[in-house]
Structures are given as C-alpha cells and as structure tokens.
Design a protein with these regions (language model features):
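A conserved beta-strand-loop-helix scaffold within acyl/acetyltransferase catalytic domains
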Residues: 1-38
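A generic structural signal for beta-strand entry/edge sites
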Residues: 29-31, 67, 95, 112
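Conserved acetyl-CoA-binding loop-helix of GNAT-fold acetyltransferases
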Residues: 39, 45-58
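Conserved active-site alpha-helix within GNAT-family acetyltransferase domains
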Residues: 62, 73-98
C-alpha cells in the first residue's frame, strides 16, 4: 500500500483525529480499493465511521471514481449492509468481498442495491474480476471451524445481498 500516493483519509472532531480510512485509488481503472475503516480507541459508537464513510464516498465520487471494492469482516457486516453494499465472494481471511459501482451518498448506494436486486447485471464487475471472484469461495479456504462458521453466518446475514450466484449467470429480467 503506497500511502505516499494514497494518504489515509481522516475525520477530525474538535481538532482530534477520530476515524481513518486506508484506501488506494486508481485513476486509470476508476476503482477505489478500500483496506480499512478505523475508529480510534475511545471514539467508538459515536457514528464517526458512518460520517467518514459518507464524506469519503462523496469525495471520491466527485473525483471521478466509478467502483469500490473492499472486504468486510463478519463482525462488520451489519454496518456495511446499512451502507448499501452487495457481496460476491469470500477472501482468504473469511471476509465477504464487495465490488460495486460507487454512488455519491449512502442513500444512493442503498437505492442502487435495491435496483440491483431486480437487475443484477448493473452491479456486475468486469469479466476478469468475475473470474477472480469465482475462485474465492468458502469451500476452497483453509479456515478454522470457528472462522468458517462466522463466514457462513455473515453470508446468511447478508441474505439477498449475496450476489455470488450472478457470477455464474443472470436470471431473466424481472422487469
């Protein structure tokens, strides 16, 4: 991660850093690759992660980014679902992988996801990415029983926002 080129994105309250996002962006591919959202110790539960996420997506949407990808730990799934994410695969750590068009606001992201339920093609990444995501599945991972259980529970929790089946083909349009 080259943080000289991609400085962490910080949220300050009363001149104090309260939350940070670590991500890289590519102007060539118009992708944001988000690595981590951190709320500093003692600042949890005050909505700062949502504040920084909201500012972050608005900033990068306005800067011309088109898609965002990230891995979401099972313990963070509920929060990410509130922000309009969909999920395709499971990474080597058992986190759920999201890759989708970037919208300017959380509400627009949620509205987009609801539309994608009826028209999944609008959310699909490019073919090369789809092929890579197909290779990332719970069954192929060497995870502990505890991790596998947490991952399966996260997949159950995301419910209809688990878009993995669409990596293998799209249903007939529901319109």
């Amino acid at each position: 991660n080259n943080y000289q080129k991609n400085a962490p994105y910080g949220l300050y309250k009363n001149d104090k850093l309260v939350s940070v996002i670590f991500a890289t962006t590519s102007h060539a591919t118009k992708y944001i690759n988000l690595y981590e959202i951190v709320t500093l110790q003692g600042q949890e539960g005050k909505g700062y992660a949502t504040d920084i996420w909201s500012q972050f997506i608005e900033h990068w949407f306005d800067a011309g980014m088109k898609r965002i990808k990230l891995s979401c730990t099972p313990s963070s799934i509920t929060w990410h679902m509130r922000n309009g994410l969909i999920f395709w695969a499971v990474d080597k750590q058992g986190s759920l992988r999201s890759d989708q068009p970037l919208k300017r606001t959380i509400n627009e992201q949620v509205d987009f996801r609801e539309y994608a339920l009826t028209e999944p093609s609008v959310a699909l990444p490019d073919k090369k990415t789809r092929m890579k995501l197909r290779e990332e599945d719970v069954e192929t991972l060497q995870l502990s029983q505890k991790k596998i259980l947490e991952t399966y529970q996260a997949i159950q929790k995301v419910g209809e926002y688990w878009f993995r089946p669409y990596l293998y083909g799209l249903p007939n349009s529901k319109k």
